[in-house]
């Protein structure tokens, strides 16, 4: 499995972002191999983003070719987009997050 963590600041009100996120959520759900996406928002620090869980590195790599992924970097509503990806350590994760075992 592969984890992606995306963070950014907002150049629009939080409420406008939340409404937009609801509108585009189904697009992320259609990504092959995406097991889940958690939407992040911390108004106090101004940090927003998401945590994505992919079935494989290949699935994570394929998602980078989508309009949704590329659009984050061109969207004037989002500032300072940062993307980090990590492999999941399968054995300890199976103990602490048994639902991820598949």
PLM-predicted stretches and their roles:
Residues 1-48, 57-65, 76-102:
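Short S/T/G/P-rich N-terminal loop/turn motif that feeds into the first structured element of a domain
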């Amino acid at each position: 499995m592969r984890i992606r963590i995306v963070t950014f600041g907002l150049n629009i009100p939080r409420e406008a972002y939340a409404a937009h996120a609801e509108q585009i959520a189904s697009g992320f759900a259609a990504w092959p191999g995406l097991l889940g996406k958690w939407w992040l928002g911390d108004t106090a620090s101004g940090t927003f983003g998401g945590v994505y869980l992919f079935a494989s590195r290949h699935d994570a790599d394929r998602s980078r070719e989508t309009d949704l992924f590329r659009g984050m970097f061109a969207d004037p509503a989002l500032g300072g987009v940062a993307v980090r990806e990590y492999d999941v350590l399968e054995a300890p994760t199976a103990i602490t997050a048994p639902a991820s075992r598949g």
